[in-house]
């Protein structure tokens, strides 16, 4: 009986997810990836809260964690060297610094890791 109840709950949750999905609420899944820097543990954090994607502007949701260095700041960083990056939070397409810094890295995934 418990197994049947679990199956019923899982089925109901799946049905609710299908009913609630809406591309306008959750953003275009086919959009462009935001550029990221990583912290010491490899956690990726976006470096800009707004970007151009094939002629349209994409904006990260308010409250998203970000490093306020911008795409150009990331491009100027030397790969795999530590930098102190200002940690912030996205607000209306801008990364607002929170007066805290975190060590961050630009990774070059094309490099071979020995």
Swiss-Prot record:
It comes from the Eukaryota. Belongs to the evasin C8 family. Its main location: secreted. Changing residue 24 to A: No effect on binding to CCL3. Both the N- and C-termini are required for chemokine-binding. This is Evasin-1. GO terms for biological process: negative regulation of chemokine activity. Glycans are attached at residues 39, 54, 62. One of its GO terms (cellular component) is extracellular region. Monomer. Residues 1-20 form the signal peptide. It is found in: Secreted. Changing residue 23 to A: No effect on binding to CCL3. The keyword tRNA-binding does not apply. Salivary chemokine-binding protein which shows chemokine neutralizing activity and binds to host chemokines CCL3, CCL4 and CCL18. Binds to CCL3 with 1:1 stoichiometry. Keywords: Disulfide bond, Glycoprotein, Secreted, Signal. Disulfide bonds join 32-53, 49-90, 66-95, 85-104. Changing residue 110 to A: No effect on binding to CCL3. The keyword Amino-acid biosynthesis does not apply. One of its GO terms (molecular function) is C-C chemokine binding. It comes from Rhipicephalus sanguineus (Brown dog tick).
């Amino acid at each position: 009986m418990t197994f049947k109840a679990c199956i019923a709950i899982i089925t109901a949750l799946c049905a609710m997810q299908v009913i609630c999905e809406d591309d306008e609420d959750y953003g275009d899944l086919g959009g462009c990836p935001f550029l990221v820097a990583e912290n010491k543990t490899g956690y990726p954090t976006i470096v800009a809260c707004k970007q151009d994607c094939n002629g349209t502007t994409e904006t990260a949701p308010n409250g998203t964690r970000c490093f306020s260095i911008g795409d150009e700041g990331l491009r100027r960083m030397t790969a795999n060297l530590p930098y102190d990056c200002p940690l912030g939070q996205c607000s209306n397409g801008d990364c607002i610094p929170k007066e805290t810094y975190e060590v961050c890295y630009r990774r070059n995934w094309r490099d071979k890791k020995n």
